[in-house]
Amino acid sequence: MSKNIDDKNEDGKKIKIIKLRKKVVKIVTHNDLSGKNNPSGSTDLHKHNNKVEYSHSRDGRTGGYSQNRDGRTGGYSQNRDGRTGGYSQNRDSLTSQYQGSTKKTYVAKNNTQNKYTTSVSFRRVIKTKVPSIVSSASSTDSENSKELNRKLGEKKKQQQESQKSYKRKKAETESKTIEQKVFEQLQKKKRENLANPIPKSIDIMGSITVSDLARKMNLKSSDLIAKLMALGVMVTINEKIDSDTATILVEEYGSKVNVVSIYDETVIEEEVEDQSKRIEKPPVITIMGHVDHGKTRLLSVLQNIDINQTESGGITQHIGAYTIVYNSREITFLDTPGHEAFTMMRSRGAQVTDIVVLVVSAIDGVMPQTIEAINHAKEANVPIIVAINKIDLPDSNPDKIKHQLSEYDLVPEDWGGDTIFVLISALKNIGISELLDMILLQADMMLLKANPSKRAIGKVLDAKIDLGRGIVCSVIIEDGTLYVGDSFVGGACYGKVKALINDKGVSVKSVGPAKAISVLGFSSMPQAGDPFQVTKTEKEAKLISSKRQDLKKYESSKNVKKVTMLNLYDSIKEGTLKELKIILKADVQGSVEALKNSLEKLTNDEVRVRVVHSSAGVITETDISFASASDAIVIGFHVRPTVKAQILADQEKVEIRKYNVIYDAISDVKSVLEGMLEPDVEQQFIGFAEVRAVINVPKVGVIAGCYVSRGLIKRDAITNVMRDGLQIHSGKISSLKRFKDDVKEVAEQYECGIMIDNYANIKEGDIIEAFEVKKVKKTFKT
């Protein structure tokens, strides 16, 4: 390290010496020229034939300098104390010689011409300005200069090589071919594929979207689309391809397709049970029948409470489940609505029940919902017990009811059939005990059993949102026992039981078979009628729920109705189909379902109802915003809007209609639909006139001089021109005159002038029939 520093210092000194030498030469030249104006000095300068002589003398010492401009040679000599020295320079050969003595003499080859002297000593100038140069100059100066030049040359050479290397690398980068770049991209893609390899086999259902298939194959959707285009199939990223196309596409990448059924993945494996643990269970009884035939009254008698006080209009709005004890035995009753809108509820009631009690009024007899209940029970293969109600009324006719029901294969036992008939009066508490005895007898004959030690299985009867507790679902347990903390799947929803509340409103830790219970803990709102089943773990519940959601999406995608150009042209462009959009909110999911089905049935060729959104719960700000954006009205069934929702509805001018009885909701929507119907246009005959003269008025047209034979003729009336009993023209009266006056109408037996719009081919003897157009309001018919 110190050696390098010394070398650098030595180089610096040498550079300074060279610079000072150059400076000395300049000073000498300057003094030579300045001697011309200073004749008192001891310096002599002679010029002759392009030759210069310079001499200097001090203390007996002489010096001489000569320069030959033509020969470019010079000599220098110095004598001091008898010693001599000489210096010569040849500019062409760039060589120099130096000899030192105490006496300095500068001698030119030819000393001639004038001499000039100066008082300034050149020797003194050298000693004053650069005293170290002359004394330190030696024979090694040229070697040091060469060494310095060598190092400078090496440094310059390194810089040149560095520049050449940079240019060479740049040229190599720019000269890469497209093939090389493609190769690098392929190598990069290969590395990515190694990180996310394509599976050897892929499971799909009947069809799959390109994006989903790409996700399963760990590829980009654009790659699959490009491959399909190469195969001659044009698709978009969200378009579905069938299993055959998917198989061909996947095989292009060296994989295989397994067409599977998602239905298998949504089924929870049944628990292996010990049949010896199955014991007798209480019967589940569903009370069914037509509206207002006394079903709810019967159940209230069984419970010794008056449920009708809490039901709007005396109509059961959703399923009520209750358990009673009779003769030390439990019986669970389900009360289903009798209104036609609640078909799905009655169907579910029949599916989860053991016995159906069909209530028929002894006055009204068999009604539409009575027949429907019979069909539901037969479809579910459930035995029926007929309870003929209201026998206390004077107009009751039980035999008539038996005869009507026998037409539906419900033949009484006393008529030789196998159907149990019981005559009751729920109002007067007549025949109730006999009915309960028949129910228990039928249950004993059916040998109803269940295993309380297995995981619970049941059905979701209804669901609602409670402001204080969240989602609350009514569940009927068909088999097993449900405990607080159990993980479960309800339809496509999963959850964990947080609380169990029985029909008395009491929180319990568990519930056994054939019992209805309110379950808290659903992750989302299930649909009424969904299967309910407890799983081993919460992880399994989430997995089954996810698979069932995929299944719902798959099935809904298959059932999407396609819009054809014909439908689009007929219903939208011509405006022949009008639409009433509704956002439906109700207190429970069952009511939402029933009302939605009833409203969407109100459709004909001109108008239809479309429920754009429906859910259980209060009317919120989100519902109002949705209604405003979609131009819909909001219907609340047993629910009301929040304060903020009502304020927003007033601001957005959104109509909110609230109902407590389903009759009123359906009736009002029908009225709205009738107002949307285009009225019928009818032509009413008002009279006719005979053409007795034809007058052609220039710049006006042809005027028919007529005599009103019958009725009257009105201006703007629609006319039919009749000739020889045939209609030859139909048009509108554009002008009606009496003499020169315009009139609105002309009565019978008066003459008038009639001009028909855009018609001039009128002749004498023609008959002009006049009609008045009337619009008649339509009544809604489905």
Curated annotation (Swiss-Prot):
The keyword Cytoplasm applies. Residues 31-43, 86-106, 133-142 have a biased composition (Polar residues). Signal peptide: none annotated. Residues 289-296 are annotated as: G1. Residues 1-106, 132-174 are annotated as: Disordered. It comes from the Bacteria. Residues 280-453 form the tr-type G domain. Residues 335-338 are annotated as: G3. Residues 425-427 are annotated as: G5. GO terms for cellular component: cytosol. It is found in: Cytoplasm. Residues 15-25 have a biased composition (Basic residues). The keyword Membrane does not apply. Its main location: cytoplasm. HAMAP family: IF_2_B. NCBIfam families: IF-2, small_GTP. This is Translation initiation factor IF-2.
